[in-house]
Amino acid sequence: TGNLLLPDPLPDGPLPAVLFANGHNSSAVGDTSHLTLVWPRRGYACFVFDTIQQTDNPGSHRGLHSGGRFDWISRGYTAAGGELLNGLRAFELLSGRPEVDPRKIGVTGRSGGGAQSFFIAVAEERVAAAVPIVGVASLKCTIGDRGYRDQCDCMYALGLYQRDNIDFAALIAPRPVLFSFGAADTLFSPDEYRTLVDKTRGIYR
């Protein structure tokens, strides 16, 4: 489920667009509206889609977070994979809209939505640019700092190969990516944010 936001009045010709992934909030109203309404006001189409276990999109992906399902990792299952499939379908829907220029679609989102915008850009080469807003961290932060105990499973694409997000970032290059983090973030270490950004920057050189 989701909402397609369009400029009013609608200009002639196809629009650049933003795919916005919602994070997981206690309410679907108000928490991210200031991040989504800005796009149609600036001439973009914006499709805001619900992540799994949010509003009208049922499911469960909090096995590590609160379900004690550590077997998910050994079985090669990652809840981020389910979220990614959901996000890729949202991208297909948006890119097929007659109002949208499919060559000019960026992705963004906050918290779990930030993680999903990152993974969507990794998997979908048609994404023109990505701006993950928090939600993306290094493997050390995830496991060493026990970040998985404080966040939804959708932020961690661990699986059997135990790949770091820095490895995934290499798959976005050379397309533009801007990481947006909080200096006072208590859930993910700002030091690990810097590690992620510095190593990703090295890939682009």
Task: Name each model-derived stretch.
Residues 1-13:
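N-terminal cap/lid segment of alpha/beta-hydrolase-fold proteins
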Residues 11-96, 103, 138-148:
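Cap/lid segment of the alpha/beta-hydrolase catalytic domain
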Residues 50, 108, 133-134, 180:
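Alpha/beta-hydrolase-fold catalytic nucleophile elbow
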Residues 98, 122-126, 171-173:
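Alpha-helix C-terminal capping segments
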Residues 99-111:
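Alpha/beta-hydrolase fold nucleophile elbow
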Residues 109-121:
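Glycine-rich nucleophile elbow surrounding the catalytic serine of serine-hydrolase chemistry
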Residues 128-170, 174, 186-197, 203:
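Mobile cap/lid helix-loop segments that gate and shape the active-site cleft of serine hydrolases
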Residues 172, 179-181:
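Short beta-strand/loop motif that positions the catalytic acidic residue
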